[in-house]
Amino acid sequence: MEDFVRQCFNPMIVELAEKTMKEYGEDLKIETNKFAAICTHLEVCFMYSDFHFINEQGESIIVELGDPNALLKHRFEIIEGRDRTMAWTVVNSICNTTGAEKPKFLPDLYDYKENRFIEIGVTRREVHIYYLEKANKIKSEKTHIHIFSFTGEEMATKADYTLDEESRARIKTRLFTIRQEMASRGLWDSFRQSERGEETIEERFEITGTMRKLADQSLPPNFSSLENFRAYVDGFEPNGYIEGKLSQMSKEVNARIEPFLKTTPRPLRLPNGPPCSQRSKFLLMDALKLSIEDPSHEGEGIPLYDAIKCMRTFFGWKEPNVVKPHEKGINPNYLLSWKQVLAELQDIENEEKIPKTKNMKKTSQLKWALGENMAPEKVDFDDCKDVGDLKQYDSDEPELRSLASWIQNEFNKACELTDSSWIELDEIGEDVAPIEHIASMRRNYFTSEVSHCRATEYIMKGVYINTALLNASCAAMDDFQLIPMISKCRTKEGRRKTNLYGFIIKGRSHLRNDTDVVNFVSMEFSLTDPRLEPHKWEKYCVLEIGDMLIRSAIGQVSRPMFLYVRTNGTSKIKMKWGMEMRRCLLQSLQQIESMIEAESSVKEKDMTKEFFENKSETWPIGESPKGVEESSIGKVCRTLLAKSVFNSLYASPQLEGFSAESRKLLLIVQALRDNLEPGTFDLGGLYEAIEECLINDPWVLLNASWFNSFLTHALS
């Protein structure tokens, strides 16, 4: 039969039939009769439409091939033979332009003259039986049905045959020829008997055995069988029933289900106010490193030794002064704290043996910066039960902040490549089980795309700082320990490199509960002048501490070196998660893997190699005001990683709430794009829930602005 089909039908029709069967997961080598039936149906649809046009006067005319008027409008739009997504797009566009009612099932054609969808049937049985099955399935007065048989019979809605006698005769003759050709090859009987009735997927899906018992047991009360329940669900009209049930609950409750259309959603309202400020625990794009290559000094690997060695590489120190004060802080104390660090590091160098850790003297400036003795005294509740006006002290509502451009710049920078590698190949962790070839191949490809990414540097920096701070918090609870902020990487040539970003001084850290806070002062090197974006640095006091010679296109230039100082705090649970930041690599690898899986299932083979090595292909990486941005697979890996890393660096209750609530709206919009006709109730309440998370957090505000870009393009 397969050979017959390939000889008998036009190659384009055969190819479309192959695609259709693949889309529905059917094997044409096994289902050969189905293959022949699909080709026949496609050919009838094309013949139905051939030569029929509409002229300038809106009349239907027949134009044979080679006629000079071939630029006329086609009378029929062919829907059959397109892939499902495209077919629904065509149907929706017809409904929008003509006002036709949207059909429940995909029809085969649209007739622009009669303004109606047409369902074409080709049957090997009695035409009237097949006609009734079709009518029963589509249950729509609006869709016109036209059935042809291989014996030359036909049947159409209200005996309206749409086409002229000659066009229909052409179709009948072709069907008769196909039947004769099959019969002469001994294929007809099997083909005729193989036709099943018009079935929907649900009807064909028989539930038997244990599953059937479970289905019957799990019905809602008052339903005796699955059939009863199905019939009830099929005929269910949601609005009245749900409203009725709700009105029994409370007078205030109503939930009328409103259709969710393209015009329904509005953009999220982002707050107004002063621009938002940087709130990460360490500097990101603005950080500056003092580095040593191929470290081999005594005590290499001991943080304090490494830090001192890095500090010695810089000779441009100068008398520090405040260039951007902290509005609410005592800025001279920040200045004195830095001078104290320099002085105490100098003292260490003068000692014969450098100690492994350094505890700072508890000076007044450090006590102030670390909030020593600032916490209100805790009193046992039993001792003050009788106090009349006992209350929790008032806290102000957080001030609303607007989105600032710096956070998008931070994100863009995080996606970029640096000239160093921040992870070794095995950083993502070996699999415990005997590793599959595909899994390790994917991991190696992914690692090579992200190992040089700036977001990966942030991961390693975050892991180091949080580990060091948690260790010190447990080991030296009462001390103001000096903790260098260090990272390690490899240069392009494979040489090891140790980097110093600055220092942290931790405060008292008697951390009993996971959420108990340890205060710390961070002091970080930078070449960024804070006066360019003062709003970003609201929480910092910035000092100018030296001049650095930078190699540039015009030779060496001297640039001022700044120190960004601020008081900050963290907790055991936050440090625990900070130490686990490598998980971001795993999360983004899994996202990439699901993209590869989707591609592989379409192509029916593993596409890992093609996915990473086909440099010409682009993939969507996100939405911007310009539309959907596309880029190389490497950029997609790095963008997904950066998103995951920023979710960790800027973790907050606002982000938790925004992610959970905006996801609901996202799913509704996606359902609309997939033509699933979603309905909603209390959409206003959903918007409220999303927008109450838009307060002042830079990362949440950026995500909300991306979400608005998505809404614009998804619905345009």
UniProtKB/Swiss-Prot annotation:
Name of this chain's protein: Polymerase acidic protein
GO BP annotations listed: cap snatching; DNA-templated transcription; symbiont-mediated suppression of host gene expression; symbiont-mediated suppression of host mRNA transcription via inhibition of RNA polymerase II activity; viral RNA genome replication; viral translational frameshifting
MF terms in GO: endonuclease activity; metal ion binding; RNA binding
Sequence motif Nuclear localization signal 2 (NLS2), residues: 184-247
The entry's keywords: Cap snatching, Endonuclease, Eukaryotic host gene expression shutoff by virus, Eukaryotic host transcription shutoff by virus, Host cytoplasm, Host gene expression shutoff by virus, Host nucleus, Host-virus interaction, Hydrolase, Inhibition of host RNA polymerase II by virus, Manganese, Metal-binding, Nuclease, Phosphoprotein
Cofactor binding description: Binds 2 manganese ions per subunit.
An example Gene Ontology CC term for this record: host cell nucleus
Compartments where found: Host cytoplasm; Host nucleus
Keyword Nucleus: no
Listed EC numbers: 3.1.-.-
Top-rank EC class of the record's enzyme: hydrolase
Motif (Nuclear localization signal 1 (NLS1)): 124-139
Residues that coordinate or bind Mn(2+) 1: 41, 108, 119-120
Subunit structure: Influenza RNA polymerase is composed of three subunits: PB1, PB2 and PA. Interacts (via C-terminus) with PB1 (via N-terminus).
Gene: PA
Post-translational modification: Phosphorylated on serines and threonines by host kinases, including human casein kinase II.
InterPro entries, alphabetized: INFV_PA, PA/PA-X, PA/PA-X_sf
Family: Belongs to the influenza viruses PA family.
Organism lineage string: Viruses, Riboviria, Orthornavirae, Negarnaviricota, Polyploviricotina
Residues that hold Mn(2+) 2 according to the record: 80, 108
Record function comment: Plays an essential role in viral RNA transcription and replication by forming the heterotrimeric polymerase complex together with PB1 and PB2 subunits. The complex transcribes viral mRNAs by using a unique mechanism called cap-snatching. It consists in the hijacking and cleavage of host capped pre-mRNAs. These short capped RNAs are then used as primers for viral mRNAs. The PB2 subunit is responsible for the binding of the 5' cap of cellular pre-mRNAs which are subsequently cleaved after 10-13 nucleotides by the PA subunit that carries the endonuclease activity.
Pfam families on file: Flu_PA
Obligatory cofactor(s): Mn(2+)
